[in-house]
Amino acid sequence: FHRDGSVREHLHRLAAEAVAAVADGAELLVLSDQAAGPDERVCDPHLAVAAVDKALREARRDDGSSRRRDVSLVLQAAGIRNVHDVMVALGFGAQALCPYAMMEKAMDGSPEPSTAADNVLSGLQKGMEKVLSTLGIHELRGYGRLVSAIGVTPE
């Protein structure tokens, strides 16, 4: 978002755009920071996905049901750097992730880039499985109810 705007304004605008896109029939939304220019600031990816998820849960169809079920959220962000970031993003509402900076870093200079990428994905998968099994959760959906923010206003 532009340097002159606030994080709050950006999140409200992003959420409104997402709700409008879903109302117009979008079934997949990709929240990405990859195209951010030099005059822009990058919003924390977890804040972005949480704001969009919340707005879609609150948005209603004509029959009164939530618009959140109409769309899948993909988070493409450089800020996804480890298993914790992955789990928080999934807990906040992302259905799929593209940790492009992590993948680029792993493959950069590697003699076998595809092996490096496979190793990153394998490590993330094992880490996710460990987190879920430690918490006694059998489905990824169950993780979301355990994620909360401390010290952040309800808004």
Residue spans for each PLM region:
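Structured alpha-helical segments in the cores of large, soluble enzyme domains
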Residues: 10-29, 48-60, 128
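Hydrophobic faces of well-ordered beta-strands that scaffold small-molecule active sites
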Residues: 29, 71-77, 90, 97-99
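Conserved, mostly hydrophobic/aromatic
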Residues: 33, 89, 139
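Alpha-helix-loop-beta-strand connector modules within alpha/beta enzyme cores
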Residues: 41-73, 122-130
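Catalytic cores of alpha/beta
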Residues: 80-93
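Flexible, glycine-rich loop/tail regions that form catalytic "lids" or insertion modules at the edges
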Residues: 1-4, 17, 21, 25-26, ...
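Active-site mouth loops of central-metabolism enzymes
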Residues: 1-15, 72-81
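Short, ordered loop/turn segments at secondary-structure junctions
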Residues: 34-36, 78, 94, 101-104
